[in-house]
Amino acid sequence: MAAAADTFLFTSESVNEGHPDKLCDQISDAVLDACLAQDAESKVACETCTKTNLVMVFGEITTKANVDYEKIVADTCREIGFVSPDVGLDADNCKVLVYIEQQSPDIAQGVHGHLTKRPEDIGAGDQGHMFGYATDETPELMPLSHVLATKLGARLTEVRKNGTCAWLRPDGKTQVTVEYYNENGAMVPIRVHTVLISTQHDETVTNDEIAADLKEHVIKPVIPEKYLDENTIFHLNPSGRFVIGGPHGDAGLTGRKIIIDTYGGWGAHGGGAFSRKDPTKVDRSGAYIARQAAKSIVASGLARRCIVQISYAIGVPEPLSVFVDTYGTGKIHDREILKIVKENFDFRPGMIAIALDLKKGGNRYLKTAAYGHFGREDPDFTWEAAKTLKWEKPQA
């Protein structure tokens, strides 16, 4: 066991699918799914905002698809659980505003030449820099603090929808503080220091009932017993009342939960949101391939922890830069690992879309829009499949 002086605390948070910002992410990605299902070449930049009894969908979409935006809004809200004004929004009676224009032809010609370019020649949809991160502290190769916060939120939704905790409402937030030990650059979780859950609830339940149910039905099934001890702190609905929630409690907007979507504050973030964007937007596709690269490095045993950065210029296929850091945990020098990354991954946007099958619709992107884009066991999350890396090992 590490001495107390050698440990530190790190905190990650998450929000439920009923949080107003996450509602907007899900509507935007449901629109993207609908477009791609009918037209794999759809160019989508679809924002959503919401407030009491109102959802507005707006942005730029160029597609051959016939999209019923009002139905997508209603179906998404209903599936989350927004079915009456008292829970924050009524899916079947809220006002829906749609303001959609086509993608700028200036952007279109620079990025994909109005569909005349080969996949390997498709330029990045914008400038920017993206990061992928992986760590060996969990089976998912994700940070434990982030994994636990995310799973607590998902469990809140599960016990709400299956009736285990019928007093729950859709909105809610979680936060987990983990005590860590830095083992020569690798992160080793020691214990869970603090668990915070703030969840929307109905009028009838007491705070004591909320605390008891959250401990029994949410925390115990999610957090391994080995991480909990007599000193673990629990803050369960500490404000004392959370009846008003969803868009009634707070306005929501697509793209405001980018740290929750990624690594919970670990690694780094280039600033670009994922939801609402088709695969030509490297904010999304670049971050996905960077995660696969970082995960493949850790899964292969080349490092215990790894971050990968890539950067782009609008209209240019090749990345401007690729960077790798293993935080001192690499089995070989980082410059050799960088060579391996470059040899095994094609970072051109058109080739990323092919390698990760990113033009497929259905409900693929909707699934990413709540409970994290990374560390998920789902065949649609193709970037989570670690590649078997090929490289020429240096001669002894």
From Swiss-Prot:
Residues that coordinate or bind Mg(2+): 13
Pathway: Amino-acid biosynthesis; S-adenosyl-L-methionine biosynthesis; S-adenosyl-L-methionine from L-methionine: step 1/1
Biological processes, Gene Ontology terms: one-carbon metabolic process; S-adenosylmethionine biosynthetic process
Cofactor entry: Mn(2+); Mg(2+); Co(2+); K(+)
Cellular component annotations (GO), alphabetically ordered: cytoplasm
UniProt cross-references to Pfam families, sorted A to Z: S-AdoMet_synt_C (PF02773), S-AdoMet_synt_M (PF02772), S-AdoMet_synt_N (PF00438)
Catalyzed reaction equations: L-methionine + ATP + H2O = S-adenosyl-L-methionine + phosphate + diphosphate
InterPro entries, sorted: ADOMET_SYNTHASE_CS (IPR022631), S-AdoMet_synt_C (IPR022630), S-AdoMet_synt_central (IPR022629), S-AdoMet_synt_N (IPR022628), S-AdoMet_synthetase (IPR002133), S-AdoMet_synthetase_sfam (IPR022636)
GO molecular function, a single term: ATP binding
Assembly mode: Homotetramer.
Similarity comment: Belongs to the AdoMet synthase family.
Entries under PANTHER family matching the protein: S-ADENOSYLMETHIONINE SYNTHETASE (PTHR11964)
Name of the featured protein: S-adenosylmethionine synthase 2
Source organism of the structure: Dianthus caryophyllus (Carnation)
Lineage of source species: Eukaryota, Viridiplantae, Streptophyta, Embryophyta, Tracheophyta
